[in-house]
Amino acid sequence: MTSKENQRADLLLLLFSVFATASANSVVFASMSELQEQYKYADSALGLIAGTGFAMGLLVQLFVAPLADRGHGKKLIQFGLGLAALGSIIFALGDSLLVFILGRGIVGASIGLTFPAVRALAAHLDTSRSAERLGAVAGMEIGGFVSGPLIGSLIIGPFGLDTTFLLFGALAVIALFIISPRKFPELASTSESQRLSFDLMRIRSVRVALILTLAVTFPTGMFDALWDRFLDDLGGNNAMTGLTFAVYGLPFILFSARAGKLIDKRSPIAVVLWLIIPISLLTISYGVIKQPWVILGVGLFEGILQATMMPAALSAIAKAAPLGRASAAQGLSGAVNVFGQMVAAFIAPTIYGAYGAFVTFFAVAIGIAAIAGMAGIMHLRNLKTAR
């Protein structure tokens, strides 16, 4: 194999690992109504199941992801896939709230192990094409997250919850066996690689990149918490909800890598700052539009913009990371993103219930613009200081 062929093979295996991990994590969202009907759980119990996965992903990204910078990248991915499979099996065999929370927590931890290591390794395969590689990773992450609920909703009915979770657990096992014989390039390691992620906050360029990724990703928490209810209030149904997720995710799968290729020739921070403007306006439009089919078209357009903005944000993190801290930086970014999504998911339903759709989406749009604006000001100060 030539060097390029090796890099391509490495990337494909990393992408498969990400897809298996993401889909194992997201399939639970297709099972929530089934769990509630079967076990008569309150809404708070469902929130506890879902929230445990987010919390575990956050903690693992902060404290375990830096191990990839010490030569353990492949092991973290393997362990992550193993946890995705184990958690899925526990969920399939469970029959109590405590067991479901345990299974969800284990599956959630798999993201904290797999995602930062894959992102760091993908960017490291060819640093001159890091945004292109990270775009491909972002596309596969979204593809996995969308596929989990879509496929799960199709097979839960005829085959049941147990079979559904076992199938996604089996996919993680297949990915584990496929990547295990492969030798991936190791990440650069220095004496700084022994440190935890937190100390990266002292670096100005890292702070800018973190704030930018927060602006890009925190609205996801609002959409996760509200989207199904929002469309239902407009007269949509479950099929429409699934279709909007599919339409939104399709541009990531098709265009993220190509967008990343263009971003490699530009400033990723500038790309994010420019795209924040139309994204904020589109977010406001959701609160104005009353037709689900029109929202479907807006979602497609937003998906195209986000498929460009996400690789740029990930590339900004990769470029800001010091030598030997690639996975730690990606883990810190992931933890910040999850925290922002958790806050948005907690607050948005309250605003929606009290003030309605327009105020909710307008508030989120203002939040996106304000956070990105803060990052832009900090970036300009960094440029002036560098001169």
Q: Which functions belong to the PLM regions below?
A:
Residues L98-I106, W293-F301:
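Paired small-residue
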Residues M1-R8, K183-L210:
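Juxtamembrane intracellular "pre-TM" segments in multi-pass secondary transporters
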Residues V60-H72, F255-S267, Y352:
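Helix-to-loop junctions at the C-terminal end of transmembrane segments
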Residues K75-I89, A270-I284:
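Structural signature of the two symmetry-related core transmembrane helices
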Residues G51-V64, A246-F255:
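Central cavity-lining transmembrane alpha-helices of secondary-active solute carriers
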Residues G103-E141:
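Cytoplasmic helix-loop-helix junction between adjacent transmembrane helices
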Residues N6-F54, R207, T217-L234:
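Helix-loop boundary and gating motifs at the non-cytosolic
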